[in-house]
């Protein structure tokens, strides 16, 4: 048991999160996640650019493509993106070394993604942004100010 803990790489292990909109069963999703070269990147500032993402993530390997998350109504950035690498090894490097780093005064959060599909770049909240931003009551300049619910009062 102690030896298995030594081989564990918690930065690369799959998290408990699973995409609720994944089309397929849980074992299919797990299998795709274990071989994926695509990362979900969250907690980004609404003002973080694709160029900044590329500059940071290319330090871990060759980036194949970046898909910025967009507000489905306004088509503006809404705090997440997908980063796809050519190899799993490069994606694992990013999971180890970029998760938890700071970009635009925000702590970047990375997780495995089963692979980008068209349409997933749009935020899932009611107004097209991220759900948690709609209910946020504090002021966050990197997220466009106050949450949308607070702004409506």
UniProtKB/Swiss-Prot annotation:
Q: Where in the cell is it found?
A: Nucleus; Cytoplasm
GO molecular function annotation: mRNA binding; RNA 7-methylguanosine cap binding; RNA cap binding; snRNA binding
Q: Where is the RRM domain?
A: 37-115
Q: Which residues bind mRNA?
A: 17, 40, 109-113, 120-124, 130-131
Which keywords fit this entry according to its UniProt record?
A: Cytoplasm, mRNA processing, mRNA splicing, mRNA transport, Nonsense-mediated mRNA decay, Nucleus, RNA-binding, RNA-mediated gene silencing, Translation regulation, Transport
Q: Does the keyword Cytoplasm apply?
A: yes
Against InterPro entries, the record matches this protein to: NCBP2, NCBP2_RRM, Nucleotide-bd_a/b_plait_sf, RBD_domain_sf, RRM_dom
Q: How does it assemble?
A: Component of the nuclear cap-binding complex (CBC), a heterodimer composed of ncbp1/cbp80 and ncbp2/cbp20 that interacts with m7GpppG-capped RNA.
| Main function | Component of the cap-binding complex (CBC), which binds co-transcriptionally to the 5' cap of pre-mRNAs and is involved in various processes such as pre-mRNA splicing, translation regulation, nonsense-mediated mRNA decay, RNA-mediated gene silencing (RNAi) by microRNAs (miRNAs) and mRNA export. The CBC complex is involved in mRNA export from the nucleus, leading to the recruitment of the mRNA export machinery to the 5' end of mRNA and to mRNA export in a 5' to 3' direction through the nuclear pore.
In the record, the note on similarity to other proteins reads: Belongs to the RRM NCBP2 family.
| Full protein name | Nuclear cap-binding protein subunit 2
- Species assigned in the record: Xenopus laevis (African clawed frog)
Encoded by which gene? Answer: ncbp2
């Amino acid at each position: 048991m102690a030896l298995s803990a030594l081989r564990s790489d918690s930065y690369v292990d799959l998290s408990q999160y699973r995409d609720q909109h994944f089309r397929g069963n849980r074992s299919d999703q797990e299998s795709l996640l274990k071989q994926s070269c695509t990362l979900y990147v969250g907690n980004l500032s609404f003002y973080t650019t694709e160029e900044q993402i590329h500059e940071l993530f290319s330090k871990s390997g060759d980036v194949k493509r970046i898909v910025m998350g967009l507000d489905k109504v306004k088509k503006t950035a809404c705090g997440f993106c997908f980063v796809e690498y050519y190899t799993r090894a490069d994606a694992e490097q990013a999971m180890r070394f970029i998760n938890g780093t700071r970009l635009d005064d925000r702590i970047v959060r990375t997780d495995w993604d089963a692979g980008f599909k068209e349409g997933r770049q749009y935020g899932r909240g009611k107004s097209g942004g991220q759900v948690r931003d709609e209910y946020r009551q504090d002021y966050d300049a990197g997220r466009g100010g106050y949450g949308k619910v607070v702004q409506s009062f």
